[in-house]
A protein has these predicted regions:
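A solvent-exposed interaction/effector surface
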Residues: 1-200
């Protein structure tokens, strides 16, 4: 993650989200930016209390089973795949409540009209990325570096006079492939934030 830009100083006002949000543009985000972001409809699979040690298997099932069927039924993503976390516990038995899916240009039911997509207990549902003030940054590199990137990101949010909130999410801008260099992977990180007064 790159160092903070001048716009990330303490007390900076948020700027309007770019056209095409939640996509942030062709170039990686330089430092940390604060955005006034609109709500975005999504198509997701929701899962609760997922052990972080096995969450990769959930991703494989969602993208390998659910979304191929949804695409056949007419689902049209408006951006890269993402994972949005509404709860995350710490420690050796860390677990999360998570939504895995894609942003949409409109409501899910306007695109997928057939019976609900449900396979092996996983069900495609409509959800939303919430509106609000959102901090964003970019991580360049392998997925194994995301933990450190999130730690640095949360620290920079505090330095900007904000408190990190829930949910937080990551957008997988670069689709991984077996023969690519992990250093070329781009993941955009997002976190709903509050001012100290809101957090009190």
């Amino acid at each position: 993650m790159s160092s903070s830009s001048p716009s990330s100083s303490d007390g900076s006002p948020a700027e309007a989200a770019p056209d095409g949000y939640p996509m942030l543009g062709a170039e990686p985000v330089d430092g940390v930016r604060l955005l006034r972001a609109p709500a975005v409809p999504t198509a997701v699979v929701q899962a609760t209390d997922v052990p972080m040690a096995t969450i990769a298997g959930l991703f494989d099932a969602v993208f390998g089973k659910i979304f191929p069927v949804a695409f056949e039924q007419g689902l049209r993503p408006a951006g890269p795949a993402f994972a949005l976390y509404t709860r995350l516990t710490d420690g050796p038995d860390a677990a999360a409540d998570v939504e895995i899916g894609f942003p949409l240009d409109g409501p899910l039911l306007e695109q997928v009209h057939d019976d609900a997509v449900e396979i092996d207990g996983l069900r495609l549902v409509a959800s939303v990325i919430p509106a609000g003030e959102v901090a964003v940054t970019t991580h360049l590199g392998g997925f194994d570096g995301l933990g450190r990137a999130w730690g640095e990101f949360i620290g920079e949010i505090g330095a900007m006079g904000r408190a990190p909130g829930i949910p937080f999410w990551e957008s997988y801008v670069t689709e991984p492939s077996p023969d690519m260099d992990p250093a070329e992977l781009r993941t955009d990180l997002y976190c709903l934030v509050r001012t100290p007064d809101d957090a009190a």
